[in-house]
């Protein structure tokens, strides 16, 4: 059986921090599924289709990465792909508190599921999608925070 990991998120938009985690975690798995979440609760700036397209553009050079859109429980998606490991990023203490709760919740829904946490590299530690959204909403230049493939896409906002 293939070693498969899932890296879920809203990716609204995808940032260099996300790509850093994808790069490092893709080396641990035969296949890494990047699962772009519907997430109506977060009121995303970009539609699900736009976020999926941006992620596909940003990850096209990774041979073992597949991008999918999903709605519903992450634990169910993991079962569908026969995945036993979720990949998550941790930047700050508040991320840890939230991710710990989510990890326990996912484990309660799928007992085989483990969560692997990645700390960002120092150069990406401050980057978040919300910072990028704020910069682009104010017509600022966020090109140094996102993959070059998607900057033309987000600069149209």
Curated annotation (Swiss-Prot):
One GO term in the molecular function aspect is: pantetheine-phosphate adenylyltransferase activity
Top-level taxonomic group: Bacteria
Q: Which reaction does it catalyse?
A: (R)-4'-phosphopantetheine + ATP + H(+) = 3'-dephospho-CoA + diphosphate
Name the UniProt key words of this record, in alphabetical order: ATP-binding, Coenzyme A biosynthesis, Cytoplasm, Magnesium, Nucleotide-binding, Nucleotidyltransferase, Transferase
Cell division recorded as keyword:
no
Q: List the disulfide bonds.
A: none
Residue numbers binding substrate: 10, 42, 74, 88
| GO aspect biological process, one term | coenzyme A biosynthetic process
Question: Chief location of this protein?
Answer: cytoplasm
* One GO CC term on file: cytoplasm
Question: Which residue numbers mark the site Transition state stabilizer?
Answer: 18
Q: What does this protein do?
A: Reversibly transfers an adenylyl group from ATP to 4'-phosphopantetheine, yielding dephospho-CoA (dPCoA) and pyrophosphate.
Its quaternary organisation is: Homohexamer.
| Name of the featured protein | Phosphopantetheine adenylyltransferase
Tell me what organism the protein belongs to: Helicobacter pylori (strain J99 / ATCC 700824)
